[in-house]
């Protein structure tokens, strides 16, 4: 399921009167087969796009919850190539965006790994530690393979950098809702909502917000502020950690996804009524 499909997914969500929901899983946590079944549970709960994390030994952008999942996946021997096998299965029923680090791509060869990702049906890629100024090679290879490169916009992003991102962006832009690393939190600052509005005014592709989005009202607020989608990771991983077995984990993430989708619907309704 590739070929620049991500923007269409956002359009379909809007057509249903809601923002899109992007769910994150760490590949190989708690196992490769379990990752596929959890992805299916997320899809059944209403997740529109799966962000599949490729385990890396130094996940500098990840908070403690996801770092724990990454460590467990690495100890189990999960490789970047295993992740493509999982992506191939998952992309049969939900679009897949890979989340990886620059060293992973470099060590496996940009063209070699991205070509295999395209063959596996991967729709997009997020390189967590790759600024737009250093993205020429990855962007060129991915564009030729019809894989969207998803760029990150942080509170510290300058007007000049956002302009460059706007020129290159496809699929969607990932807005980092705060400084620091990923992780669930209870508050959502007005600065985040202003950041969403600022980015929305400067790019022509969908805008999705992540980092700390964990509750229904978080999703509602960012969609109401103008975001086209919300990205939820740590909250799903926590539900997996709380579970006694994979069946319970599937049920927990499915039910959480359903709740978050309702937040995306409420946020879209609020935004539409104020326009």
Swiss-Prot record:
Its EC number is 4.2.1.20. It comes from the Archaea. One of its GO terms (molecular function) is tryptophan synthase activity. It is an enzyme of class 4 (lyase). InterPro entries: Aldolase_TIM, RibuloseP-bd_barrel, Trp_synthase_alpha_AS, Trp_synthase_suA. Gene3D superfamilies: Aldolase class I. Pfam families: Trp_syntA. Disulfide bonds: none annotated. Belongs to the TrpA family. PANTHER family: TRYPTOPHAN SYNTHASE ALPHA CHAIN, CHLOROPLASTIC, TRYPTOPHAN SYNTHASE, ALPHA CHAIN. The alpha subunit is responsible for the aldol cleavage of indoleglycerol phosphate to indole and glyceraldehyde 3-phosphate. This is Tryptophan synthase alpha chain.
